[in-house]
Amino acid sequence: MAQHQMPRRHFLGTVGAAGLGSAAIGLTTGTGQAEAAPAGTQGAAGASAGQEAALPYPTLRRPFAMPGVKEQDWTGALFVGTGESRFALRVGLLTAQGKLLREKMTNYLWRIGPMTPDGAYKEVQVTTDDRTVMPAHLEALREVIAHPDQWSQSAVADATAKLPQLQKKYDQVQSEKRTIRVRYARTGDGSGLVGAVTALDDDTTLVLELSSPWGEEATFALDGEGLTGSAPGLLEKNRTGHIRLSPTERADSSGCYASVADMTAAVTGGSGAPGTAVAALVYRLGKGRTITFAARVDDRPLEARTPEAHEVEHTLAAAGAHVRGGNLTGSGPVGRAADAVRDALSLNTNYDRDRLRNFVMWGWGGGGGLFTGWDSAFDAVDAALVSRTLAVQHETDVFEAPAPPNQVPLQGPRYDQQNSGPMHAYAVWRLYTKFGDRSVLEKAYPALVTFHDLLPEWDTDKDGLLETPYFGDRIGGRGNHLGLDDSPVYAAYHRIAKQGGSGDKRDNTDLTDVALNSYYALLAETLAKMARVLGRPEDATRFAAQHERIRRLLNDRLWHPEKGLYLSRYLDGTWNEVVTPTVFYPMYAGLATPERARILVERHLLDPEEFWGDYVVPSVARNDPAYCSGGPVHPSSGHFRFFDRYGEGSAPEQWKGAVWPPMNATVYDGVKRYGFDDVAGRFAARSTAMYLDAWDKENWFPESFDPEPGQSIMDSAVDTAWRTYSWSNAMAVQGLHELISDNPWDGDPSALMFGTLSLPGTNTVANVQLRGHTYAVSAGPDRTTLVRDGRTVFRATGARVAVRNFVLRGSGASFDINADGPARVEVFAEDGRARGRKVPGGRTHVSL
């Protein structure tokens, strides 16, 4: 029976015109640390109606509506009721060939943002063009045909055959392209949202669909001009959730169907069996026409409330305008990357249907669930700049995740990647230094201690340094123990049978690995810091001693004095002389001596024959024979030097030259840790520029980057799965951390770092959450300002400055400052008094 129709004028007054309130975006405590059984299983049911669900901590308060958090459903929204009833709203787009695009939308993303990580506002554009043929592909083929002397005869023949085919396909796709703009804003207490879909081309058909997100029990129906649905709670079977979708105008057609397949058949011109599994509204739009709607989830049936289109638009406009006002944002050549990072990580925020919270998807086309390898550790550090709530949920999710099949059964970071434990330890520690939150430390610490204590099984000769695990004879996978796949460092190690160990079936090898031992030391150092915070002094002493032992051994055995590099070495004493950015990893782990760090930076990092240049850093040194050895190289080609043929890899793939965000982030942190402020700023500026080049050009944040400007890895790539890869944001976060950061290294973990000696121009970043305060920074050639909670607390004039160990007290502040010339500094403490002094160029400790 149809519900009573509420007059349009009452709609927004009932559901709330404001964006999502703080009560809805906070972390619920649920029932303390109680774990919920995987949703959708028998274990997820149990509580009776009226009982509080056994939600895990941390998670989102129920009920909630979140746009775009079901994997790759960028145009849709997930609705979750109090008892964990679940509903999916999707916006589908029909292609000219009659194919319905309704989920797994990564290939069809056209424009991203603006958006927020809490779902208060989200905007995307999707298109029927999957960009498998792009102008760069066609240009590359023309280049091959025009210069047959530079390519093999078979490559020229392949290009000659494919160019007309791909040109025809491209022209057809462009002529038939349909693009829509989708906007959402959460309303009221966060259980509802309003949305709008705008056709950017004529003859556009879109579908508004209500269904179950993961095939769970639910029923749907038509009700007047709208759609309704109901579903039992997965945590509380006796509690039923209800959803209503209310459009502002009648659809051209509508129906309820027995399955998604039936619905798809019906909206694409066929017939579909009626039923209650899915309901859909179909609209046929001309260019510029917009459909608006509202949707809400509740514990009881919802009255039909039809919104006014102009009220929906007003709410969307207000929420969109608030994106920069209440979330990470910035300006300037580097600072503007803050908005891109916010949008990218908001896009890749996903809901874990088993552990009932949000996390950051690592990549693989935006899907694949939670990944507990090293990738997601970078995602946690980056997400912490965007949203404390998201970062804490993400890293908690990692440490509650079971081991992948056929692996050592450790909960948390996966053991087949020996750097996943160290990197997640570093990520968890940075959540503590950023927010002062011990909850994730307490959860992570036992698993990380176990991970650390298993690592000696990779010490083949029992000398205290680790050797590379054997990962098989496939060249492309021999570096998989560190996620380095085909890195040439690992091409020639030898297998040695392992005795005993954790149950990991891999054997040992004869290669003492600089990178692996740097991670080993990082884990020991981080565990020592965690142990001090958690009141475990004996553990702190043990792990600090372990870090010192690795530092001594690595400097004794893996420093090549003639080359001035930390290099891996075989057990027979011969050196592995392949030079990659892992030579800098001892700086990241605090192992390098100050003099050796200076040699690494001045003689190697800044050498354009090795690593320096407009693009940094290649995954193999440019003067190493292994550089770009993964395929043919065409030196005379201006823009397609590394292009081979359509659909195939290129010379820098994968770790044979391409620039990788985790490598850059590791090198940057090491350089910054050792106090090379000028170099760190220049490095961060280059990393950020590479990220922004891809973002500005295609709205992508790719898995890896070209090692040289204007080349073809990403522009000519066909595989769209790597275009929205979360760790890409680590490139831009270097620039943002250069402006303001926590202090993850020595000294007071509550202290701040801010300012820069060498980022270009004047840059700002705002709405950065650190230790319970909201910060903004402006840093330019002759003025640096730090604002806390809306009040200026630091100002330096006359020079560029980089500030470390900044601690603001009620009656003053203390900090270390590095200035590129004489400057005046002022501190405005909590007592309201201004305190200032002059500082010379160089380094000065200041107490005011």
Residue spans of the language-model regions?
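Terminal accessory carbohydrate-recognition/targeting modules of carbohydrate-active enzymes
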Residues: 2, 40-330, 721-726, 741-848
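N-terminal export signals
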Residues: 2-4, 10-30
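C-terminal capping/lid segments that line or modulate ligand- or cofactor-binding pockets
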Residues: 49-86, 424-427, 431-434, 560-604, ...
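Extended, well-ordered alpha-helical scaffold segments
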Residues: 307-311, 315, 333-341, 387-399, ...
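Extended glycan-interaction surfaces of carbohydrate-active proteins
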Residues: 328-368, 393-412, 464-512, 552-659, ...
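Aromatic-rich carbohydrate-recognition surfaces in CAZymes
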Residues: 369-492, 514-517, 576-577, 657-674, ...
